Amino acid sequence: MNIYAVGGAIRDALLGVPVQDRDYVVVGATPEQMAAQGFRPVGKDFPVFLHPDTQEEYALARTERKTAAGYHGFQFYYAPDVTLDEDLARRDLTINAMAREVSPDGTLIGPVIDPFDGQADLRARVFRHVSDAFVEDPVRILRIARFAARFADFTVADETLALMRRMVDAGEADALVPERVWQEIARGLMEATPSRMFDVLRECGALARVLPEVDALWGVPQRADYHPEVDTGVHVMMVVDYAAKQGYSLPVRFAALTHDLGKATTPADVLPRHVGHEGRSVELIKPLCERLRVPNECRDLALVVAREHGNLHRVMEMGAAALVRLFERSDALRKPARFAEMLQACESDARGRLGLDTQPYPQAERLRVALVAARSVDAGAIARGIGNDAMQIKDAVHRARIDAVKQALAIAE
Protein backbone atom coordinates (compact mmCIF):
# COMPACT_ATOMS: atom_id res chain seq x y z
CA MET A 1 0.00 0.00 0.00
CA ASN A 2 1.33 3.45 -1.00
CA ILE A 3 -0.30 6.76 -0.09
CA TYR A 4 0.08 9.95 -2.13
CA ALA A 5 -1.01 13.55 -1.60
CA VAL A 6 -2.56 14.68 -4.87
CA GLY A 7 -4.18 17.59 -6.63
CA GLY A 8 -4.71 20.94 -4.98
CA ALA A 9 -2.35 20.34 -2.08
CA ILE A 10 0.60 19.84 -4.43
CA ARG A 11 -0.46 22.69 -6.72
CA ASP A 12 -0.85 25.21 -3.89
CA ALA A 13 2.41 24.19 -2.22
CA LEU A 14 4.28 24.75 -5.49
CA LEU A 15 2.59 28.13 -5.89
CA GLY A 16 3.54 29.10 -2.36
CA VAL A 17 -0.05 29.78 -1.30
CA PRO A 18 -1.90 28.31 1.69
CA VAL A 19 -3.06 24.76 1.00
CA GLN A 20 -6.86 24.76 0.93
CA ASP A 21 -7.59 21.14 0.02
CA ARG A 22 -5.80 17.98 1.09
CA ASP A 23 -6.69 14.88 -0.89
CA TYR A 24 -4.97 11.52 -0.76
CA VAL A 25 -4.90 8.56 -3.12
CA VAL A 26 -4.11 5.05 -1.93
CA VAL A 27 -2.49 2.69 -4.43
CA GLY A 28 -2.36 -1.08 -3.96
CA ALA A 29 -5.08 -1.39 -1.31
CA THR A 30 -8.55 -2.91 -1.03
CA PRO A 31 -11.54 -1.54 0.91
CA GLU A 32 -11.07 -4.37 3.40
CA GLN A 33 -7.45 -3.40 4.05
CA MET A 34 -8.45 0.23 4.61
CA ALA A 35 -11.16 -0.76 7.07
CA ALA A 36 -8.73 -3.01 8.92
CA GLN A 37 -6.48 0.01 9.52
CA GLY A 38 -9.32 2.02 11.04
CA PHE A 39 -10.35 4.07 8.01
CA ARG A 40 -14.10 4.77 7.87
CA PRO A 41 -15.82 4.37 4.47
CA VAL A 42 -17.88 7.36 3.31
CA GLY A 43 -17.92 7.19 -0.50
CA LYS A 44 -21.10 6.18 -2.32
CA ASP A 45 -19.95 5.81 -5.93
CA PHE A 46 -16.35 4.76 -5.21
CA PRO A 47 -14.30 3.93 -2.10
CA VAL A 48 -13.45 7.05 -0.11
CA PHE A 49 -12.37 6.75 3.51
CA LEU A 50 -11.85 9.10 6.43
CA HIS A 51 -8.56 8.84 8.31
CA PRO A 52 -9.18 7.61 11.87
CA ASP A 53 -7.24 10.51 13.40
CA THR A 54 -7.26 13.48 11.00
CA GLN A 55 -10.65 12.79 9.32
CA GLU A 56 -9.05 13.72 6.00
CA GLU A 57 -10.27 11.92 2.88
CA TYR A 58 -8.36 9.02 1.33
CA ALA A 59 -9.59 7.53 -1.95
CA LEU A 60 -8.53 4.28 -3.56
CA ALA A 61 -6.82 4.80 -6.91
CA ARG A 62 -9.40 4.49 -9.65
CA THR A 63 -10.18 4.98 -13.30
CA GLU A 64 -13.51 6.11 -14.68
CA ARG A 65 -15.52 5.77 -17.86
CA LYS A 66 -18.37 7.93 -19.15
CA THR A 67 -21.65 6.01 -19.40
CA ALA A 68 -24.31 8.77 -19.52
CA ALA A 69 -24.71 12.54 -19.77
CA GLY A 70 -24.11 14.80 -16.81
CA TYR A 71 -22.14 14.84 -13.61
CA HIS A 72 -23.25 11.42 -12.37
CA GLY A 73 -22.90 9.51 -15.63
CA PHE A 74 -19.69 7.64 -14.77
CA GLN A 75 -18.65 4.07 -14.12
CA PHE A 76 -15.68 3.66 -11.77
CA TYR A 77 -13.07 0.93 -11.60
CA TYR A 78 -10.91 0.54 -8.52
CA ALA A 79 -8.57 -2.28 -7.63
CA PRO A 80 -5.07 -2.74 -6.20
CA ASP A 81 -3.67 -2.89 -9.75
CA VAL A 82 -4.76 0.67 -10.66
CA THR A 83 -1.59 2.76 -10.82
CA LEU A 84 -1.02 6.31 -9.63
CA ASP A 85 -0.49 7.52 -13.21
CA GLU A 86 -3.82 5.99 -14.22
CA ASP A 87 -5.54 7.78 -11.36
CA LEU A 88 -3.88 11.11 -12.22
CA ALA A 89 -4.84 10.71 -15.88
CA ARG A 90 -8.55 11.02 -15.06
CA ARG A 91 -8.09 14.46 -13.47
CA ASP A 92 -9.19 17.69 -15.08
CA LEU A 93 -6.13 19.93 -15.34
CA THR A 94 -2.41 19.28 -15.53
CA ILE A 95 -1.84 21.52 -12.51
CA ASN A 96 -4.19 19.27 -10.52
CA ALA A 97 -2.61 16.02 -11.75
CA MET A 98 0.52 15.99 -9.60
CA ALA A 99 1.35 13.95 -6.51
CA ARG A 100 3.90 13.30 -3.79
CA GLU A 101 4.29 10.20 -1.68
CA VAL A 102 3.28 10.38 1.98
CA SER A 103 5.37 8.63 4.63
CA PRO A 104 3.77 6.66 7.50
CA ASP A 105 4.17 9.69 9.78
CA GLY A 106 2.29 11.92 7.30
CA THR A 107 5.19 13.91 5.85
CA LEU A 108 5.71 14.30 2.11
CA ILE A 109 8.67 12.42 0.72
CA GLY A 110 10.36 12.12 -2.65
CA PRO A 111 9.99 14.29 -5.75
CA VAL A 112 6.82 15.69 -7.26
CA ILE A 113 5.26 13.07 -9.51
CA ASP A 114 4.19 15.01 -12.58
CA PRO A 115 3.34 12.84 -15.60
CA PHE A 116 1.48 15.61 -17.47
CA ASP A 117 3.88 18.56 -17.03
CA GLY A 118 1.73 20.40 -14.53
CA GLN A 119 4.75 22.22 -13.12
CA ALA A 120 5.48 23.76 -16.51
CA ASP A 121 1.88 24.95 -16.77
CA LEU A 122 2.08 26.39 -13.26
CA ARG A 123 5.13 28.41 -14.28
CA ALA A 124 3.36 29.55 -17.46
CA ARG A 125 0.16 30.34 -15.52
CA VAL A 126 -1.96 28.16 -17.83
CA PHE A 127 -5.01 25.98 -17.25
CA ARG A 128 -4.62 22.97 -19.57
CA HIS A 129 -6.70 19.81 -19.66
CA VAL A 130 -4.98 16.47 -19.03
CA SER A 131 -6.69 14.53 -21.82
CA ASP A 132 -9.72 14.52 -24.09
CA ALA A 133 -11.55 12.71 -21.29
CA PHE A 134 -12.04 16.25 -19.97
CA VAL A 135 -15.19 16.44 -22.10
CA GLU A 136 -16.82 13.66 -20.11
CA ASP A 137 -17.59 15.83 -17.07
CA PRO A 138 -19.35 19.18 -17.70
CA VAL A 139 -18.65 20.32 -14.13
CA ARG A 140 -15.07 20.82 -15.28
CA ILE A 141 -16.19 23.88 -17.25
CA LEU A 142 -17.39 25.46 -14.01
CA ARG A 143 -14.30 24.32 -12.12
CA ILE A 144 -11.89 25.96 -14.57
CA ALA A 145 -13.92 29.17 -14.35
CA ARG A 146 -13.79 29.01 -10.55
CA PHE A 147 -10.04 28.42 -10.61
CA ALA A 148 -9.72 31.52 -12.81
CA ALA A 149 -11.43 33.53 -10.05
CA ARG A 150 -8.87 32.20 -7.56
CA PHE A 151 -5.80 32.48 -9.79
CA ALA A 152 -6.65 35.64 -11.72
CA ASP A 153 -3.33 35.79 -13.59
CA PHE A 154 -3.85 32.36 -15.20
CA THR A 155 -5.22 31.95 -18.71
CA VAL A 156 -7.03 29.01 -20.31
CA ALA A 157 -4.99 27.16 -22.94
CA ASP A 158 -6.40 27.68 -26.43
CA GLU A 159 -6.98 23.97 -26.96
CA THR A 160 -8.73 23.68 -23.59
CA LEU A 161 -11.00 26.63 -24.34
CA ALA A 162 -11.83 25.07 -27.71
CA LEU A 163 -12.73 21.83 -25.94
CA MET A 164 -14.96 23.72 -23.50
CA ARG A 165 -16.76 25.41 -26.40
CA ARG A 166 -17.36 22.05 -28.06
CA MET A 167 -18.80 20.72 -24.81
CA VAL A 168 -21.18 23.67 -24.57
CA ASP A 169 -22.20 23.30 -28.22
CA ALA A 170 -22.87 19.60 -27.60
CA GLY A 171 -25.28 20.46 -24.78
CA GLU A 172 -23.10 19.16 -21.95
CA ALA A 173 -23.62 22.36 -19.93
CA ASP A 174 -27.37 21.76 -20.11
CA ALA A 175 -26.90 18.45 -18.27
CA LEU A 176 -25.48 20.15 -15.16
CA VAL A 177 -27.63 19.69 -12.07
CA PRO A 178 -28.76 23.02 -10.55
CA GLU A 179 -27.27 22.33 -7.13
CA ARG A 180 -23.82 21.79 -8.64
CA VAL A 181 -24.08 24.93 -10.76
CA TRP A 182 -24.90 26.96 -7.65
CA GLN A 183 -22.14 25.28 -5.65
CA GLU A 184 -19.48 26.23 -8.18
CA ILE A 185 -20.84 29.74 -8.79
CA ALA A 186 -20.98 30.38 -5.04
CA ARG A 187 -17.43 29.15 -4.55
CA GLY A 188 -16.24 31.32 -7.43
CA LEU A 189 -18.00 34.37 -6.00
CA MET A 190 -16.05 33.86 -2.79
CA GLU A 191 -12.69 33.88 -4.57
CA ALA A 192 -10.46 36.95 -4.88
CA THR A 193 -11.49 38.02 -8.40
CA PRO A 194 -14.97 36.64 -9.21
CA SER A 195 -15.16 38.50 -12.52
CA ARG A 196 -12.58 36.12 -13.98
CA MET A 197 -15.00 33.23 -13.47
CA PHE A 198 -17.63 35.00 -15.55
CA ASP A 199 -15.03 35.98 -18.17
CA VAL A 200 -14.15 32.33 -18.72
CA LEU A 201 -17.78 31.20 -18.75
CA ARG A 202 -18.56 33.87 -21.36
CA GLU A 203 -15.56 32.94 -23.49
CA CYS A 204 -16.68 29.33 -23.82
CA GLY A 205 -20.40 30.13 -24.13
CA ALA A 206 -21.39 28.45 -20.88
CA LEU A 207 -22.62 31.60 -19.13
CA ALA A 208 -25.52 31.87 -21.57
CA ARG A 209 -26.50 28.31 -20.61
CA VAL A 210 -26.19 28.42 -16.82
CA LEU A 211 -26.84 32.12 -16.07
CA PRO A 212 -28.47 33.66 -19.16
CA GLU A 213 -29.79 36.55 -17.06
CA VAL A 214 -26.22 37.62 -16.28
CA ASP A 215 -24.87 36.88 -19.77
CA ALA A 216 -27.47 39.25 -21.25
CA LEU A 217 -25.95 42.27 -19.46
CA TRP A 218 -22.93 42.66 -21.75
CA GLY A 219 -23.48 45.16 -24.52
CA VAL A 220 -26.29 46.97 -22.68
CA PRO A 221 -25.33 50.67 -22.43
CA GLN A 222 -25.81 52.91 -19.40
CA ARG A 223 -25.58 56.68 -19.03
CA ALA A 224 -21.91 57.63 -19.11
CA ASP A 225 -22.41 60.43 -16.57
CA TYR A 226 -23.40 57.82 -13.98
CA HIS A 227 -21.41 54.92 -15.40
CA PRO A 228 -18.13 55.89 -17.08
CA GLU A 229 -17.63 52.19 -17.91
CA VAL A 230 -20.94 52.36 -19.91
CA ASP A 231 -21.39 48.60 -20.45
CA THR A 232 -23.71 47.04 -17.85
CA GLY A 233 -21.87 43.71 -17.84
CA VAL A 234 -18.57 45.47 -17.17
CA HIS A 235 -20.20 47.47 -14.36
CA VAL A 236 -21.63 44.39 -12.66
CA MET A 237 -18.25 42.66 -12.76
CA MET A 238 -16.64 45.73 -11.18
CA VAL A 239 -19.29 45.68 -8.45
CA VAL A 240 -18.71 42.00 -7.69
CA ASP A 241 -14.94 42.45 -7.62
CA TYR A 242 -15.26 45.45 -5.30
CA ALA A 243 -17.41 43.38 -2.92
CA ALA A 244 -14.81 40.61 -3.05
CA LYS A 245 -11.96 43.04 -2.38
CA GLN A 246 -13.78 44.20 0.76
CA GLY A 247 -14.21 40.61 1.94
CA TYR A 248 -18.01 40.81 1.93
CA SER A 249 -20.22 37.76 2.48
CA LEU A 250 -21.66 35.45 -0.18
CA PRO A 251 -25.15 37.03 0.07
CA VAL A 252 -23.63 40.48 -0.55
CA ARG A 253 -21.62 39.22 -3.53
CA PHE A 254 -24.66 37.47 -5.00
CA ALA A 255 -26.71 40.65 -4.55
CA ALA A 256 -23.92 42.56 -6.29
CA LEU A 257 -24.10 40.10 -9.20
CA THR A 258 -27.88 40.33 -9.62
CA HIS A 259 -28.83 43.89 -8.65
CA ASP A 260 -29.01 45.19 -12.24
CA LEU A 261 -30.38 42.16 -14.10
CA GLY A 262 -33.40 44.18 -15.21
CA LYS A 263 -31.24 46.46 -17.34
CA ALA A 264 -30.96 43.66 -19.91
CA THR A 265 -34.71 43.96 -20.55
CA THR A 266 -34.84 47.75 -20.91
CA PRO A 267 -36.58 48.64 -24.20
CA ALA A 268 -34.04 49.65 -26.82
CA ASP A 269 -35.79 52.94 -27.59
CA VAL A 270 -35.15 54.34 -24.08
CA LEU A 271 -31.51 53.31 -23.71
CA PRO A 272 -29.19 54.28 -22.10
CA ARG A 273 -31.77 55.19 -19.41
CA HIS A 274 -33.11 52.34 -17.29
CA VAL A 275 -36.22 53.63 -15.55
CA GLY A 276 -37.92 50.81 -13.63
CA HIS A 277 -35.03 48.37 -13.94
CA GLU A 278 -35.22 47.68 -10.20
CA GLY A 279 -38.60 45.98 -10.46
CA ARG A 280 -37.57 44.10 -13.59
CA SER A 281 -34.48 42.86 -11.74
CA VAL A 282 -36.67 41.47 -8.97
CA GLU A 283 -38.76 39.56 -11.49
CA LEU A 284 -35.64 37.97 -12.99
CA ILE A 285 -34.00 37.12 -9.66
CA LYS A 286 -36.98 35.10 -8.42
CA PRO A 287 -36.94 32.39 -11.13
CA LEU A 288 -33.13 32.37 -11.24
CA CYS A 289 -32.99 31.55 -7.54
CA GLU A 290 -35.69 28.93 -7.88
CA ARG A 291 -33.94 27.30 -10.83
CA LEU A 292 -30.54 27.09 -9.12
CA ARG A 293 -31.99 26.45 -5.63
CA VAL A 294 -30.16 29.47 -4.25
CA PRO A 295 -30.18 29.58 -0.43
CA ASN A 296 -32.85 31.80 1.11
CA GLU A 297 -30.40 34.25 2.69
CA CYS A 298 -28.79 34.93 -0.69
CA ARG A 299 -32.14 35.18 -2.49
CA ASP A 300 -33.73 37.48 0.09
CA LEU A 301 -30.84 39.93 0.17
CA ALA A 302 -30.60 39.94 -3.63
CA LEU A 303 -34.31 40.77 -3.93
CA VAL A 304 -34.30 43.64 -1.46
CA VAL A 305 -31.07 45.10 -2.89
CA ALA A 306 -32.42 44.91 -6.44
CA ARG A 307 -35.66 46.61 -5.41
CA GLU A 308 -34.18 49.33 -3.21
CA HIS A 309 -30.63 50.11 -4.40
CA GLY A 310 -31.75 53.15 -6.37
CA ASN A 311 -33.52 54.50 -3.30
CA LEU A 312 -30.47 53.93 -1.10
CA HIS A 313 -28.34 55.91 -3.52
CA ARG A 314 -30.81 58.83 -3.20
CA VAL A 315 -31.07 58.95 0.60
CA MET A 316 -29.17 62.26 0.84
CA GLU A 317 -32.29 63.81 -0.70
CA MET A 318 -34.70 62.00 1.64
CA GLY A 319 -36.29 63.38 4.75
CA ALA A 320 -37.05 61.46 7.92
CA ALA A 321 -40.46 60.21 6.76
CA ALA A 322 -39.05 58.74 3.54
CA LEU A 323 -36.22 57.09 5.45
CA VAL A 324 -38.60 55.44 7.89
CA ARG A 325 -40.71 54.16 4.99
CA LEU A 326 -37.54 52.73 3.44
CA PHE A 327 -36.70 50.96 6.70
CA GLU A 328 -40.21 49.53 6.92
CA ARG A 329 -40.21 48.31 3.30
CA SER A 330 -36.82 46.65 3.64
CA ASP A 331 -37.59 45.16 7.08
CA ALA A 332 -34.51 46.94 8.43
CA LEU A 333 -36.13 47.53 11.81
CA ARG A 334 -36.42 43.78 12.43
CA LYS A 335 -33.32 42.74 10.48
CA PRO A 336 -30.59 45.35 11.02
CA ALA A 337 -27.81 42.87 10.17
CA ARG A 338 -29.34 42.23 6.75
CA PHE A 339 -29.72 45.97 6.24
CA ALA A 340 -26.01 46.37 6.97
CA GLU A 341 -25.37 43.90 4.13
CA MET A 342 -27.71 45.96 1.92
CA LEU A 343 -25.47 48.95 2.58
CA GLN A 344 -22.41 46.92 1.63
CA ALA A 345 -24.01 45.82 -1.64
CA CYS A 346 -25.11 49.37 -2.48
CA GLU A 347 -21.72 50.81 -1.61
CA SER A 348 -20.20 48.21 -3.94
CA ASP A 349 -22.63 49.32 -6.65
CA ALA A 350 -21.66 52.97 -6.21
CA ARG A 351 -17.94 52.25 -6.26
CA GLY A 352 -17.95 49.53 -8.91
CA ARG A 353 -17.65 52.13 -11.65
CA LEU A 354 -14.71 53.21 -13.77
CA GLY A 355 -12.49 55.55 -11.76
CA LEU A 356 -14.94 55.78 -8.85
CA ASP A 357 -13.79 52.95 -6.60
CA THR A 358 -12.69 55.34 -3.84
CA GLN A 359 -15.47 57.92 -4.09
CA PRO A 360 -17.22 58.79 -0.80
CA TYR A 361 -20.52 57.09 -0.06
CA PRO A 362 -22.08 59.31 2.65
CA GLN A 363 -25.41 57.58 2.17
CA ALA A 364 -24.20 54.67 4.30
CA GLU A 365 -23.50 56.78 7.38
CA ARG A 366 -26.77 58.72 7.03
CA LEU A 367 -28.67 55.44 6.90
CA ARG A 368 -26.81 53.98 9.87
CA VAL A 369 -27.57 57.03 12.01
CA ALA A 370 -31.21 57.06 10.94
CA LEU A 371 -31.70 53.34 11.54
CA VAL A 372 -30.24 53.46 15.05
CA ALA A 373 -32.66 56.28 15.84
CA ALA A 374 -35.67 54.53 14.35
CA ARG A 375 -34.91 51.33 16.24
CA SER A 376 -34.56 53.22 19.52
CA VAL A 377 -38.31 53.87 19.60
CA ASP A 378 -40.01 51.70 22.24
CA ALA A 379 -42.98 50.35 20.31
CA GLY A 380 -44.13 48.30 23.30
CA ALA A 381 -44.35 51.34 25.56
CA ILE A 382 -46.33 53.23 22.91
CA ALA A 383 -48.72 50.30 22.53
CA ARG A 384 -49.30 50.08 26.27
CA GLY A 385 -50.16 53.76 26.39
CA ILE A 386 -52.75 53.46 23.63
CA GLY A 387 -54.57 50.18 24.29
CA ASN A 388 -55.95 47.75 21.73
CA ASP A 389 -56.36 49.96 18.65
CA ALA A 390 -53.86 48.33 16.27
CA MET A 391 -54.08 51.02 13.59
CA GLN A 392 -53.59 53.79 16.12
CA ILE A 393 -50.58 51.97 17.60
CA LYS A 394 -49.03 51.47 14.17
CA ASP A 395 -49.50 55.15 13.28
CA ALA A 396 -48.11 56.36 16.62
CA VAL A 397 -45.03 54.14 16.36
CA HIS A 398 -44.47 55.29 12.79
CA ARG A 399 -44.66 58.97 13.80
CA ALA A 400 -42.38 58.39 16.78
CA ARG A 401 -39.78 56.85 14.50
CA ILE A 402 -39.95 59.81 12.15
CA ASP A 403 -39.44 62.21 15.06
CA ALA A 404 -36.49 60.17 16.35
CA VAL A 405 -34.86 60.12 12.91
CA LYS A 406 -35.38 63.89 12.49
CA GLN A 407 -33.63 64.57 15.78
CA ALA A 408 -30.75 62.19 15.04
CA LEU A 409 -30.13 63.67 11.60
CA ALA A 410 -30.24 67.21 12.96
CA ILE A 411 -27.55 66.32 15.50
CA ALA A 412 -25.45 64.50 12.90
CA GLU A 413 -25.55 67.44 10.50
Swiss-Prot record:
Catalytic activity: a tRNA precursor + 2 CTP + ATP = a tRNA with a 3' CCA end + 3 diphosphate; a tRNA with a 3' CCA end + 2 CTP + ATP = a tRNA with a 3' CCACCA end + 3 diphosphate
Cofactors demanded by this protein: Mg(2+); Ni(2+)
A Pfam family matched in the record: HD
Gene3D superfamilies: Beta Polymerase, domain 2 (3.30.460.10), cca-adding enzyme, domain 2 (1.10.3090.10)
Biological processes, Gene Ontology terms: RNA repair; tRNA 3'-terminal CCA addition
Disulfide bonds: none
Residue numbers binding Mg(2+): D21, D23
UniProt keyword terms in alphabetical order: ATP-binding, Hydrolase, Magnesium, Metal-binding, Multifunctional enzyme, Nickel, Nucleotide-binding, Nucleotidyltransferase, RNA repair, RNA-binding, Transferase, tRNA processing
Cofactor binding note from Swiss-Prot or TrEMBL: Magnesium is required for nucleotidyltransferase activity.
EC numbers: 2.7.7.72, 3.1.3.-, 3.1.4.-
Residue ranges of domain HD in the record: 232-333
Binding site for ATP: G8, R11, R91, R143, R146
Residue positions binding CTP: G8, R11, R91, R143, R146
An MF annotation (GO) of this entry: magnesium ion binding
PROSITE patterns in alphabetical order: HD
Assembly mode: Monomer. Can also form homodimers and oligomers.
Family (UniProt): Belongs to the tRNA nucleotidyltransferase/poly(A) polymerase family. Bacterial CCA-adding enzyme type 1 subfamily.
Domains: entry comment: Comprises two domains: an N-terminal domain containing the nucleotidyltransferase activity and a C-terminal HD domain associated with both phosphodiesterase and phosphatase activities.
Cited function: Catalyzes the addition and repair of the essential 3'-terminal CCA sequence in tRNAs without using a nucleic acid template. Adds these three nucleotides in the order of C, C, and A to the tRNA nucleotide-73, using CTP and ATP as substrates and producing inorganic pyrophosphate. tRNA 3'-terminal CCA addition is required both for tRNA processing and repair. Also involved in tRNA surveillance by mediating tandem CCA addition to generate a CCACCA at the 3' terminus of unstable tRNAs. While stable tRNAs receive only 3'-terminal CCA, unstable tRNAs are marked with CCACCA and rapidly degraded.
PANTHER family hit by this protein: MULTIFUNCTIONAL CCA PROTEIN
Comment field (misc): A single active site specifically recognizes both ATP and CTP and is responsible for their addition.
Descriptive protein name: Multifunctional CCA protein
Gene this chain is encoded by: cca
